[in-house]
Amino acid sequence: MNGITAWMEKYLVPVAAKIGSQKHLVALRDSFIGMLPATLAGALAAMISAIVTTFPSAIQQMMLGATAFSKLAPEKVWTLANTPIIGDLNNISALVNQGTLTVIGLIFAFSWGYNLARAYGVNDLAGGIVSLATLFAGLPNQMGKFTAALGTGKAGVAATDKLNGVLGDQGLAAWKPLFASAHLDAGAYFTVIIMGALAVIIYAKLMLADITIKMPESVPPAVAKAFLAIIPTIAALYIVGLIYYIIGKLTNDSVINLITHYIAEPFQILSQNIFSVLIVTLFVSVFWFFGLHGPNVLAPVLDGIWGPLGLNNQALYFQVHSQGIRDLIAKGAVDKAHAINGDYVNLWVRGSWDAFAWFGGSGGTITLVIAIILFSKRKDYKIVGRLGLAPGIFNINEPVLFGLPVVLNAIFFIPFAVAPLISVIIAYTATALHLVDPVVNAVPWVTPPIMNAFMATGFDWRAIVLTIINLIITFVIWVPFVIAANKLEETELD
């Protein structure tokens, strides 16, 4: 064990430390964190929609049976959507969803540019605008496809005029751009990360090189600050615009479609492999063992790959609710290749770890705390355990990780690494076998275990059972090591 620890300290820890302090990755992590208010607002909207429309019909189905329920006329299905106030709240939630999850890609674009510009020490507001403009500049005009399909002949011109007449009533026109919603939601993440970074870095480098318009001191600071960003912003947007134009001419396709097809989709396909999930789970524990915040170090991976998949599930859940999710899974629509009418469910997303494996924080340490309270004979451990219980309920485990400590503790490293791996295997298998719904909703990470899984799966009662099973198994894994620690002197573990 000492040899493995020494090897990790020599080769792995320096790499992890560099990753954790690399400004681009830190900016990416902060970008995802900054989006939490919008993400959770969208999650609340989805929960309200489920309570109003899904729960009543689910109760009715349980009472009548699936066969009898399927024969009901639509107006006979229970719902609260037509109830005064509650129905209005549901409609308001739809608007909230439209302003959050439907355009989460735009929110991320601004957050990414803002935090990346801040990392370079330049005007962060302008950086957010540059990144957002970069995304819009590369979006294909869907309206152009309609007009191109109509043709330029006499009939085509007449059809286009008729189309303009219909669109004009909505304040639209065939010559105006129309963007696909799939390019505005989580599907835009990879394009924003790549092209947004390129544009903002160009902007930042020019700002740092002082290639700017300087105003007299008499000009108000806000105006002077805006003028400083003009030349770098124009240069950055024209450079990415040129890239978009050249790639479009060479491939007859848009950059966002190419990035999605050749970069995003392969990563997301790999992410649904159980081995990929286990590798990330293990590395989170390994980084924590050396005192590095595992989820933060791996945030670009966790939030960059599994995060968008969670948002996709969330958006789908808002539309089809729990039964629709189950129907898609039952029909094998668990990846894009097997999508039904473009819809598919991701079995494992970012929130799956919080719901089914990281109870009380990474390593399932809430069960460690309980094991210490019940079985530890060490006074120092019991003190830390009692102090760590309340924070642990809300998934804050730093008092335990550094107070016992678990960090650099050779005895505790084994259960700290193994327990979440076992939990992930059980949860992934249960989800794949349709024994529990996948995570379809964003839940604050401080939500206590059991409640977290119940809410995250769209209030699937089976998630409660699965969580309790995993908690018991995690507890059983921790107990022998807590008992073994009793036999060691305090100095041997310090």
Curated annotation (Swiss-Prot):
Subcellular locations according to the entry: Cell membrane
PROSITE patterns per the UniProt record, alphabetical: PTS_EIIC_TYPE_3
Reported consequences of knocking out the gene: Disruption of the gene abolishes growth on cellobiose and lactose.
Listed transmembrane segments: 32-52, 92-112, 119-139, 188-208, 227-247, 274-294, 355-375, 406-426, 463-483
Topology relative to the membrane: Multi-pass membrane protein
GO biological process: N,N'-diacetylchitobiose import; phosphoenolpyruvate-dependent sugar phosphotransferase system
Gene Ontology molecular function terms on file: protein-N(PI)-phosphohistidine-sugar phosphotransferase activity
UniProt xrefs under PANTHER family: PTHR33989, PTS SYSTEM N,N'-DIACETYLCHITOBIOSE-SPECIFIC EIIC COMPONENT
Described function: The phosphoenolpyruvate-dependent sugar phosphotransferase system (PTS), a major carbohydrate active transport system, catalyzes the phosphorylation of incoming sugar substrates concomitant with their translocation across the cell membrane. Involved in cellobiose transport with PtcA and PtcB. This system can also transport lactose.
Protein name per UniProt: PTS system cellobiose-specific EIIC component
